[in-house]
Curated annotation (Swiss-Prot):
This is Translation initiation factor 6. The keyword DNA-binding does not apply. GO terms for cellular component: cytosol. Transmembrane segments: none annotated. Keywords: Initiation factor, Protein biosynthesis. Belongs to the eIF-6 family. Binds to the 50S ribosomal subunit and prevents its association with the 30S ribosomal subunit to form the 70S initiation complex. InterPro entries: eIF6. It comes from the Archaea. GO terms for molecular function: ribosome binding; translation initiation factor activity. Gene3D superfamilies: L-arginine/glycine Amidinotransferase, Chain A (3.75.10.10). SMART domains: eIF6.
Length: 221
């Protein structure tokens, strides 16, 4: 598994706009085809152009693993229908006032760390659609668990100030080793600059050598 630097819309915040699992990368409408082909090749997936809630913010608004994808209630019916048709996944909608689902849920194929802002009913929906166990807990004082942690099925990166005991809890839930890291030259909101599936890790173009070493420990060792 490689770690590769990339940028999107001339910036390093690749995780805001893109979502990926082991089969598909979801990219915004109008995204350059040459870049789409490159990303798909690196990640070993097919690419699909879509919008969510008529925006480009796919990574921020949805959460996807290899079993399902969860959309916010602001997603349009035609977007839901398109993803249902094109993806061999359970497709669900979370009926919550919180719509940036990628910011409040961190999931792999085994577990999901969910923001305390979401309800027990929301957790049940997450569990049903993604096929995972859930836990609700802040990370380093943040309710936005999906912003400060990224996981695949072999590792996870978490906010540099995350509590060690919490990391053990999350490690048991997700079934992976977890390492503290930042991204893009000191940004602690790791999901903004990482795309992780089980084939490759793509990071924002400003990510430093020491950060790549931390991510190597998280995902490759």
């Amino acid at each position: 598994m490689d770690i590769i630097k990339f940028d999107v819309y001339r910036g390093p915040n690749i995780g805001v706009y893109i979502s990926v699992n082991d089969n598909t990368i979801l990219l915004p409408m109008g995204f350059a085809k040459t870049k789409a082909e490159k990303l798909a090749k690196y990640l070993g997936v097919n690419y699909l152009f879509t919008s969510i809630a008529n925006t480009r913010l796919i990574g921020a608004l949805c959460i996807m693993n290899n079993k399902g994808i969860l959309l916010p209630k602001t997603a349009y019916q035609n977007e839901f229908d398109f993803l249902k048709k094109e993806l061999d996944l359970e497709v669900g909608v979370l009926d919550s006032k919180l719509t940036a689902l990628g910011n409040v849920i961190c999931a792999n194929d085994k577990g999901a760390v969910v923001s305390p802002w979401l309800s027990k009913e929301d957790c049940q929906t997450i569990s049903d659609v993604l096929g995972v166990e859930t836990i609700q807990k802040k990370i380093a004082g943040f309710n936005q668990t999906g912003v400060v942690m990224v996981a695949n099925n072999s590792g996870a990166a978490i906010h540099p100030e995350a509590d060690e005991e919490d990391m053990k809890t999350f490690s048991n839930l997700l079934g992976v080793k977890i390492e503290q890291s930042s991204i893009n030259n000191g940004i602690p909101y790791v999901s903004s600059g990482i795309l992780a599936n089980n084939n490759c890790i793509i990071v924002g173009s400003l990510t430093t050598g020491p950060e790549i070493m931390m991510l190597t420990r998280a995902f490759l060792n």
